[in-house]
Amino acid sequence: MNTKIFKSAVITSFISSCMLMGCNSNRTNDETNSANQMNALNLTSEWDKTFPKSEKVNHSKITFHNRYGITLAADLYTPVNASGKLPAIAVSGPFGAVKEQSSGLYAQQLAERGFLTIAFDPSYTGESGGEPRYVASPDINTEDFSAAVDCLMNREDVDSEKIGILGICGWGGIAIQAAINDPRIKATVASTMYDMTRVNANGYFDSENTAEQRNFKRAAMVAQRTEDYKSGFYKSGGGVVSPLPDDAPQFVKDYYAYYKTPRGYHKRSLNSNNGWNVTSNLPFLNFKFFDYADELESAVMIVHGDKAHSFYFGKDTYALLKGDNKEFVVVAGANHTDLYDGLSVIPFNKIESFFNENLK
């Protein structure tokens, strides 16, 4: 196969693929409602994460809802023997992953360091609700972070003035977008971030940044939605390409090494399996993140490996932010997926210090 053609096809396919208590800790009707929601969502009771459970934290499952009425499922992590009101962090990502993968690892690590954390599945994915399944939306997914903040604000074990968020990969960009619109969020970390609106509109490395190329994508996707309506079935874009050809781009090989091997595979992960619905890309072509990034007053830390194919997303987004409470942490030698689960690579000490400084 022609290498150039293969890489273009793989990259286009990958963009398609990437795309038991209540939240209130009092025993009230909210708890009964949440229990009913959990039963409706059929949440698993087993520990099915891609990482071992820590003895330093307590774990349970909770649910909450966004303002579109979608019920989201989350894992709650709290430090063992914690008391009083804690600073809290909501975590999600990577884009096309589930809470049993990278976001859960981050949440557990931060709970070990004294924070109450939740790792949640976005709308339409994982154990969360929403139909049809495997849909991504720049609006609804941004709302998901604010819905997580709603949940945390109403917990009696959370200090409502000390709430932060952390997004990984595509959810890093979504986290920053959420923080722009939600001043309740006092601190945001974007780890190995993507700007999903930019990559969908412009292609990787801005290689498809013309009106003609965008219109070609639009035409292809609206043709697909016509076919989806006719068939009554939403075509999936496919997860990470498998089997992996030798001439795949290095970053696709890195994704394969995480999503398609025992290291990070999960049965509910879109990227590990069949990916997003193809038409999920469409709204990202018509929606631009960070137009008001210079108005974001709260603290932001962007963490990126300098060997990541996605490094330019972090670098360029950081340049849009204003204020001395913004920080860009470069992890020397790290690629994109090293920051998914690399406990010796992810700068947890810096992340902990950042949240301690800004959630006080």
What are these regions (language model features)?
Residues 109-129:
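Conserved alpha/beta-hydrolase
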Residues 177-260:
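Alpha/beta-hydrolase-fold enzymes
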Residues 334-345:
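Catalytic histidine-centered segment of alpha/beta-hydrolase-like enzymes
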Residues 135-156:
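Alpha/beta-hydrolase active-site loop
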Residues 85-94:
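Short beta-strand element of the alpha/beta-hydrolase
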Residues 296, 302-304:
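Short beta-strand/loop motif that positions the catalytic acidic residue
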Residues 39-84:
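N-terminal cap/lid segment of alpha/beta-hydrolase-fold proteins
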Residues 96-108, 122:
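The serine-hydrolase catalytic nucleophile loop
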